[in-house]
Amino acid sequence: MRFRRNIERIGEIMAVEISKHLTYATEQVQTPLATAEVQVPQDKVVLGTILRAGLPLHQGFLNMYDHAENAFVSAYRKEVEDDHGNVQLEIVSEYLAAPSLENKTLMLVDPMLATGMSMEIAYKALLSHGTPSHLHLVCAFATPQAINYLQENIPQEATLWCAVIDPELNEKKYIVPGLGDAGDLCFGEKL
């Protein structure tokens, strides 16, 4: 699907930009013809994503950081009714697979940062596998509301990377103008 591939491309571009902020050391490498000095990244990178919508953005990063470890967290929206009959949005997470994050650089990627709640829940779930030395939160689309939410709810100093910041959310908490449900656009509608 074209949307899926375009999100992957955005991931590749953002991964290159973030690579400019990693730590490098000069090392000698032997080529078939001579010895050369090259800059080699020193950061131990873990690429984390939120299933299912985050997979294409994650793949874009993995194309650039092919030695990175991987982490996956499930998160989905669930509408719940409170005692007064008001419908509230709740984020549910039921699955986590991750390596140790202790003293590693975590790049947590998700294409849509609408409210910031999924990113917060994913990050806090991943902390059960250690504390990263640095956190990069990466999205293709974000809202000011989500950015403010993360600034208030992510305790660790983090770097936030957004390709586009759209102005608002609609009543269903989708980014406007945005693109809709990234998971559905990438992989088809949920059953």
Where are these regions (language model features)?
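PRPP-associated nucleotide enzymes
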Residues: 1-191
